[in-house]
Each structure stands twice: as structure tokens, then as C-alpha cells.
């Protein structure tokens, strides 16, 4: 047997071993999803428009319907969260914060914006599914 054979075998198989033993991509990696990429990822994770309340209705509008649904859902959530509840005697409303803080808080509650800026995992997207 040629003494150089094991050395050549290591040279040829070394990169394959490094690639095979390297870190495997995890399913929980954050991926920045903006616009229609975000909507398509939601469709992929949630299972498509078949869960719509009107099953017979043809799916028209595609991405636009998804975005409208998300805006409506989070608009209603924002209205409930920001509703001015009746305060008891002696309680004062909190002082108004700056426009910057309100804008930042609004961005934090918008899942499409969050996924675009910070990235989302599949688990994050699953929490947005309507079922």
C-alpha cells in the first residue's frame, strides 16, 4: 500500500467531513420577512386560505387579503389595549409619552413590521395563525 494514500484520502474527504459535521441549520432561525415574503411564509406555516370562514368563496386578492386581515386583527387588539377605562376616584391617567415612544410601541405590536425589521421564527409565525 502506498504511504501517501491515507494522506490523499484525508485531503479529499476532509472538506466533506467538515461540511457533514458542521452546525446544522435550526428550524428556529430568525428570518427577515418583508412584504409578500412575510405573507407567503404565513400561508406556508398556517396552511393556506382554506381556513377562511367562507370556504366556497374563491381566494381573490391573495397577499392583500392577508395584510388586511393582519391590520384589522392588530388594529382591534390595539384599540382594546389603548381603550380609556374608567378610573376610580383619586386615580389619574398616566402622563402622555413622547411621539417616539408611541411610534416604537405601535411598531412592536405590528407583526409584519417586526418580522421585517427583526426577523421571525416559525414559532412566531404560528402565533399569528387564525386557528
Curated annotation (Swiss-Prot):
The record's listing under CDD domains reads: IlGF_relaxin_like (cd04365)
Q: List the disulfide bonds.
A: 34-116, 46-129, 115-120
Query: Does the UniProt entry include the keyword Signal?
Result: yes
Please give the Pfam families that the UniProt record associates with this protein.
Answer: Insulin
Record's GO cellular component terms:
extracellular space
Q: Where, subcellularly, is it found?
A: Secreted
GO molecular function annotations of the record:
hormone activity
Record-level GO BP terms = adenylate cyclase-inhibiting G protein-coupled receptor signaling pathway
Superkingdom of origin organism:
Eukaryota
Which InterPro entries does this entry report, sorted A to Z?
Answer: INSL3/INSL4, Insulin-like, Insulin-like_sf, Insulin_CS
Signal peptide per UniProt: 1-20
Query: What keywords are assigned to this protein?
Result: Cleavage on pair of basic residues, Disulfide bond, Hormone, Secreted, Signal
Q: Name the principal localization, coarsely classed.
A: secreted
Q: Pro-region residues?
A: 58-104
**Briefly, what is this protein's role?**
Seems to play a role in testicular function. May be a trophic hormone with a role in testicular descent in fetal life. Is a ligand for LGR8 receptor.
Subunit (UniProt):
Heterodimer of a B chain and an A chain linked by two disulfide bonds.
**Similarity comment:** Belongs to the insulin family.
Q: What is this protein called?
A: Insulin-like 3
Amino acid at each position: 500500500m502506498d504511504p501517501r494514500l491515507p494522506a490523499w484520502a484525508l485531503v479529499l474527504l476532509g472538506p466533506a467531513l467538515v461540511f457533514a459535521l458542521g452546525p446544522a441549520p435550526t428550524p428556529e432561525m430568525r428570518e427577515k420577512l418583508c412584504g409578500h415574503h412575510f405573507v407567503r411564509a404565513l400561508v406556508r406555516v398556517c396552511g393556506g386560505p382554506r381556513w377562511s370562514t367562507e370556504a366556497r368563496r374563491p381566494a381573490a386578492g391573495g397577499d392583500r387579503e392577508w395584510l388586511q386581515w393582519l391590520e384589522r386583527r392588530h388594529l382591534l387588539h390595539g384599540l382594546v389595549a389603548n381603550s380609556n377605562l374608567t378610573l376610580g376616584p383619586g386615580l389619574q391617567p398616566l402622563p402622555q409619552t413622547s411621539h417616539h415612544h408611541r411610534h416604537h410601541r405601535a411598531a412592536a405590536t405590528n407583526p409584519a413590521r417586526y418580522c421585517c425589521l427583526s426577523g421571525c421564527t416559525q414559532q412566531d409565525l404560528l402565533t399569528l395563525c387564525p386557528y
